A protein has these predicted regions:
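C-terminal capping/lid region of NAD(P)-dependent oxidoreductase domains
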Residues: 162-170
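Short glycine-rich anion-binding loops that position phosphate/pyrophosphate groups of nucleotides
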Residues: 13-15, 50-51, 113, 144, ...
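Active-site-adjacent helical/loop segments in soluble small-molecule enzymes
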Residues: 103-163
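A polyampholytic, Gly/Pro-enriched intrinsically disordered region
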Residues: 1-3, 91-97, 131, 161
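Glycine-rich phosphate/pyrophosphate-binding loop at beta-loop-alpha junctions
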Residues: 20-107, 169-174
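Short, small-residue-enriched loops and turns at beta-alpha junctions
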Residues: 15-20, 79-80, 114-118
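Active-site/ligand-binding-proximal alpha/beta "capping" segment
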Residues: 2-48, 121-134, 141
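Short beta-strands and strand-loop turn motifs
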Residues: 7-13, 72-73, 108-111
């Protein structure tokens, strides 16, 4: 500031309305690729912790893919806090993009975080083994492993019809 510049502070997990706008634009890539490959995602599932990613995905999907549900798997064992943060960042991102956030579109699924943040449970370890063995996909026990464990549980529960196209986003961490 002393030099006449406008510094940009980047919070943990890029958790801000502006950070959410970045993931709103990620929906454009998913939209383009799904059309090129001739499928329409029923849902996009990912692990939700710092909340801006999910907020951005929801705002972006509302604009480009309104038929697609965004499902966040809580990885912090704090689903109420995560949902509140998604709503907060989502309203801010939506305002930046000239739209609104429907709070009914915010879904944070609890029960897959294990005992606490950074502490995996058996379903997470199993999901990591499945992904590595069947797809050569490297997952970590803090984020993506918990997210995939949640997705597997939702599939086994019959959440979606068997012919549904579900996109799992691996945001890193491994």
């Amino acid at each position: 500031k002393r030099h006449g510049k406008r510094p940009c502070l980047v919070p943990y997990g890029v958790s801000s309305p502006l950070g959410a706008v970045g993931y709103a634009s990620a929906i454009d890539e998913i939209f383009t690729q799904s059309r090129e490959l001739d499928f329409r995602p029923t849902a996009i599932v990912y692990c939700s912790g710092s909340a801006a990613t999910q907020a951005g995905l929801i705002v972006g999907a509302a604009l480009a893919m309104p038929e697609t549900r965004i499902v966040g798997i809580d990885i912090d064992a704090e689903p109420e806090r995560v949902r509140a943060d998604v709503i907060d960042y989502g309203h801010g991102a939506a305002a930046m993009l000239g739209t609104t956030l429907r709070e009914a579109d915010v879904e944070v699924v609890a029960g897959h975080a294990g005992p606490a943040y950074c502490v995996p449970h058996q379903a997470t370890i199993d999901a990591i083994k499945i992904a590595g063995t069947l797809e050569a996909l490297v997952l970590d026990p803090v984020y993506s492993g918990k997210g995939l464990a949640g997705l597997i549980a939702l599939i086994h529960s019959g959440r979606w019809p068997k012919d549904s196209d579900i996109v799992f986003i691996h945001t890193g961490g491994a």
